[in-house]
């Protein structure tokens, strides 16, 4: 399962949220956790100091880092955005569209705390694990 940035942020903030507990449980159970390159990028820019970035990099490298399929994921992300807009929902983040395109391409769900993924689920058939 792909874990979106929104879930990682909850986990890294050590909150007692549903998302934080869910990810902690998956890690403890040694479940498959997929980290898209763009999610890794977002998490590495989240703090300005290099020590925190290095800690996050080491944490994320324990999991499956999934590369983008450059042209295919870009085209599919644009199509997802257009389809959602035609359906009356504007996805706020193109990175969410890229993550969704990757998830659809590799056949996995996305765990998230972001309403954009539910719009994508509605219009594009993305499998999701909402953790609000």
From Swiss-Prot:
Induction statement: Induced by hypoxia.
Cofactors (names): Mg(2+); Mn(2+)
SUPFAM superfamilies linked to this entry: PIN domain-like (SSF88723)
Amino-acid positions noted as binding Mn(2+) in the UniProt annotation, renumbered to this chain: 96, 114, 116
GO MF annotation list: magnesium ion binding; RNA nuclease activity
Protein's GO biological process: negative regulation of growth; response to hypoxia
Chain positions recorded as Mg(2+) binding sites: 96
Regulation: RNase activity inhibited by EDTA.
EC identifiers of the protein: 3.1.-.-
Cofactor descriptive note: The heterotrimer binds 1 Mg(2+)-Mn(2+) pair while the heterotetramer binds 2 pairs. Both metals are shared by the toxin-antitoxin pair.
Function: Toxic component of a type II toxin-antitoxin (TA) system. Degrades total E.coli RNA, which is partially inhibited by cognate antitoxin VapB15. Upon expression in M.smegmatis inhibits colony formation, which is neutralized by coexpression with VapB15.
Assembly, per entry: Crystallizes as a VapB15-VapC15(2) heterotrimer and as a VapB15(2)-VapC15(2) heterotetramer; each toxin pair forms a homodimer which creates a channel in which the antitoxin binds.
Other notes: In this enzyme the conserved residue Asp-4 binds Mg(2+) via H(2)O.
Family to which the UniProt record says this protein belongs: Belongs to the PINc/VapC protein family.
Name recorded for this polypeptide: Ribonuclease VapC15
Organism: Mycobacterium tuberculosis (strain ATCC 25618 / H37Rv)
Gene (name only): vapC15
